[in-house]
Amino acid sequence: MTNPWNGVLTATATPFKSDLSIDYDKYAEHVAWLAENGTHGVIPNGSLGEYQVLTADERAKMVEVAVAAAPKGFNVVPGVAAYGAAESRKWAEHAQKVGAGAVMLLPPNAYRASDDEVLAHYKEVAKVGIPIIAYNNPFDTKVDLTPKLVARIANEVPNVVAIKEFSGDVRRIWQIKKLAPRIEVIVGADDVFLELSTAGISGWIAGFPNALPKESMELYNLAISGNFKEAAPMYAALHDVFHWDSKKEFIQAIKLGMDHVGRYGGPTRLPRLPLPQHEQDQIHREMDVALAYFKNR
């Protein structure tokens, strides 16, 4: 791909053993498998990777394992989110040191930062010099990177090159393109991918390629080539599954989807508990529908 943040980047799940320690061998194998199945890169230590419940040593090793397992040309873009800029900067420095091509950065966590504070946060981490994907997730961070704020960041923080847009508002891409034209827009939620792809996107940071990489890549390639006649029914078959990516239970759901196709999803760490049985059954049914589409077409 042209840049490390282009194409389909899988926000990877962290594989925990039954004792909730990390299985780094399984993670390395998963990174290699995603590359073999045509995706363009991985994002360790994102929201899906449960970065909030990893120790500092675990978080560092996840990035190091991903970089070591990635074949040539396969991108590793670690999440570097933290409560404050000092810690985020530390993780950005580590990512740069071990060979990552870019990082993904949320606004300050758990604090309703003002626009000026958000801007200061990005400026501090940008001092590292590595390209930054800003990540808008107002549901988890209490901060909304509005198009006007994105424009300020674009004007004042040159190292911010793109934004992962997870607000769910499909109209925002047009506002961002108008107000911050140099910022590349990356789809941040699986269940609005096709809608946003019509507006000209630079990539897709996705959850369900953890379970459905070939299927997700086929959809992506159809959409970016403008073949919506074929992409639309495929997206419809996938959409019930994809919608879990926008629910608070998305980590458990995606890990269950991985288990469904014979991959290793495994458990989550507290505070996340296993899903109720009726929700597990629903995900299995929806995975069956998605897989049947590709089998029977």
Residue spans of the language-model regions?
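Active-site beta->alpha loop and helix N-cap motifs at the rims of alpha/beta catalytic domains
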Residues: 2-142, 152, 258, 297
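Short, flexible micro-motifs
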Residues: 10, 44, 49-52, 82, ...
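Charge-dense, low-complexity intrinsically disordered segments
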Residues: 21, 53, 57, 112, ...
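Catalytic alpha/beta core domains of metabolic enzymes, predominantly
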Residues: 128, 139-248
